Amino acid sequence: MERIEGASVGRCAASPYLRPLTLHYRQNGAQKSWDFMKTHDSVTVLLFNSSRRSLVLVKQFRPAVYAGEVERRFPGSLAAVDQDGPRELQPALPGSAGVTVELCAGLVDQPGLSLEEVACKEAWEECGYHLAPSDLRRVATYWSGVGLTGSRQTMFYTEVTDAQRSGPGGGLVEEGELIEVVHLPLEGAQAFADDPDIPKTLGVIFGVSWFLSQVAPNLDLQ
């Protein structure tokens, strides 16, 4: 996962996942404009494995995080994106600079599937757990990327056991996914969420906090 070679950055000419646009509008009599990205909504799933007394998370390499880290540590590294072709990122960082811990998640990009069905699909593909929509509890729906994308994300929760894991997870190879399943013991969950040196998403921090306050007190963890 962390063996990243030949990283280069260029212009995004076309993408099935995002499209840059500008909204022109008048507010309180003043003409304004705002650049944004049209993207898909998404779902996340917080899984608690009662057999292992652990939260089920995923870890994967995120190219955007990697490129952002290069620019953060070496300002100006992304300046070449306005050139004709992709330019190699220099200096290169180890692949670990782009690896993050996240909740199981996926885009809502398949017409006809409910949010629950998308969540079940992702839980199987990424983590190997077979779920039914009725297994899911909706935790919250919120806006993400309000300054850039304006997309919505819905978080679900479910309890699983080892018996429900009948697949390896790891994502879809044909889509280039390379995902590692991570089991986070409850005993260290809060410390994990609080540690600023562990690269993780806000969803993980929120999910751990929500679980420990709303679910854990009602569980028999003896």
Swiss-Prot record:
PROSITE patterns: NUDIX
Nudix hydrolase domain span: 38-206
Enzyme class: hydrolase
pH-dependent activity: Optimum pH is 8.0-9.5.
A molecular function GO annotation: metal ion binding
Motif (Nudix box): 111-129
Gene3D superfamilies in the record: Nucleoside Triphosphate Pyrophosphohydrolase
Cofactor(s) needed: Mg(2+)
Record's GO cellular component terms: cytosol
Chief location: cytoplasm
Catalytic activity: UDP-sugar + H2O = UMP + alpha-D-aldose 1-phosphate
Enzyme Commission number(s): 3.6.1.45
GO biological process: nucleoside phosphate metabolic process; protein N-linked glycosylation via asparagine; ribose phosphate metabolic process
Keywords: Cytoplasm, Hydrolase, Magnesium
Subcellular location: Cytoplasm
InterPro entries in the record: NDP_pyrophosphatase, NUDIX_hydrolase-like_dom_sf, NUDIX_hydrolase_dom
Family the entry assigns: Belongs to the Nudix hydrolase family.
Physiological role: Hydrolyzes UDP-glucose to glucose 1-phosphate and UMP and ADP-ribose to ribose 5-phosphate and AMP. The physiological substrate is probably UDP-glucose. Poor activity on other substrates such as ADP-glucose, CDP-glucose, GDP-glucose and GDP-mannose.
Complex formation: Homodimer.
Classification via NCBIfam families: nudix-type nucleoside diphosphatase, YffH/AdpP family
Name of the protein in question: Uridine diphosphate glucose pyrophosphatase NUDT14
Gene transcribed to yield this protein: NUDT14
